[in-house]
Amino acid sequence: MTKDTIERIRKFTEDREWDQFHSPANLAKSIVIEAAELLECFQWSDEEYDLQHVKEELADVMVYCQNLLDKLGLDADEIINMKMTQNEV
């Protein structure tokens, strides 16, 4: 995710004063809820789906992930690379 996109997410959240609701637990729950909505896109068929709806739900998941990263003071590249290194062992 680009720095501009990350800043846009932060501004969107700040403008709405949503940070007060963004505890790590609430954000983790929101990620799961949005992931379930993404899964619904494929509920009745593995081959037929609405790509626009998939993009929207995937974006929702990613926005909540970025919010959780911010709340925990983490960097996506850093933790993904750490996990990839662990997985390569």
Language-model features: locations:
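Flexible "arm" and connector segments at domain edges
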Residues: 1-89
